[in-house]
Amino acid sequence: MMTQSIRRSMLTVMATLPLLFSSATLHAQANSVQQQLEALEKSSGGRLGVALINTADNSQILYRADERFAMCSTSKVMAAAAVLKQSESDKHLLNQRVEIKKSDLVNYNPIAEKHVNGTMTLAELGAAALQYSDNTAMNKLIAHLGGPDKVTAFARSLGDETFRLDRTEPTLNTAIPGDPRDTTTPLAMAQTLKNLTLGKALAETQRAQLVTWLKGNTTGSASIRAGLPKSWVVGDKTGSGDYGTTNDIAVIWPENHAPLVLVTYFTQPEQKAERRRDILAAAAKIVTHGF
């Protein structure tokens, strides 16, 4: 005859089993993701950094997420956000006009070059920098703020102690291995991007503007977006530089799920290496599987 004590013990074990199996399943899934990212990196011949934040519960998927990578044009998000922050106390700021001279043009200016000998508003410069990765637009934003160090100072004001912007376009894209200039880590960037787009780092109007710019990006179709279901909404900012450096940072709205924040950074040992957007797409597919 089963004693009351034994019955209680069996009930305790039975109640615990689902938790144990659930924990074991999650652990196995995490190991599988890490192994897949490691295999992807090995096949690429480069160095891959990934940070995903699931805002439903703030769980994370991390791979080399505390290592420094050159940001390249993903740093444009911070510069644009810094200008948006200023506009919180000056409602006319984004309409301020900035002169565009031929001597301002650098190596990639798809929007600014159309305004030579004219002007662009700070809002237009923000859109050009984030949606078309216009380098002259980025330099104008940096100049307005007072230099690269002011962009870094804005990051510090958000609690980001890792981000550092040292130069302007196009030299910030040299991405020399081991060079700490113009770098951050995947995790630091993911946390800051989350704060800027989904948190309280910006006021509601400015936050909505930043998200609108990111959703309207024209340069990311072959990167993170390519690894996600077509029905998901994505706002992202790409970046690329020497050493085959290929980056993309994104806020993702899956169907019937809280937003995800994903940072993918990739670089290679050879200075003239080709960009590998396919690696970013593959990484995105791996870490978002199951959402």
Swiss-Prot record:
Annotated membrane-spanning segments are none
Keywords (alphabetical) are: Antibiotic resistance, Hydrolase, Plasmid, Signal
Q: Where, by residue number, does substrate bind?
A: 237-239
* Reactions catalysed according to its record: a beta-lactam + H2O = a substituted beta-amino acid
Record flagged with keyword tRNA processing: no
Q: Return the Pfam families for the record.
A: Beta-lactamase2
Q: What range does the record give for the signal peptide? A: 1-29
Active-site residues? 73 (acyl-ester intermediate)
GO MF entry, a single one: beta-lactamase activity
Any single GO BP term: response to antibiotic
Q: What is its EC number?
A: 3.5.2.6
Show the NCBIfam families listed in the entry: bla_class_A (NF033103), blaCTX-M (NF033089)
Q: How does it assemble?
A: Monomer.
Q: Briefly state the protein's biological role.
A: Has strong cefotaxime-hydrolyzing activity.
Which protein family is named in the record?
Answer: Belongs to the class-A beta-lactamase family.
Fill in the misc note. The class A beta-lactamase family has a specific amino-acid numbering system, sometimes called Ambler or ABL numbering and often misspelt as Amber. A multiple sequence alignment was used to derive a consensus sequence and then the consensus was numbered taking into account insertions and deletions. This allows use of identical numbers, e.g. for active site residues, despite differences in protein length. UniProt always uses natural numbering of residues, hence there appear to be differences in numbering between this entry and some papers.
Q: What is this protein called?
A: Beta-lactamase Toho-1
Q: What is the name of the gene encoding this protein?
A: bla
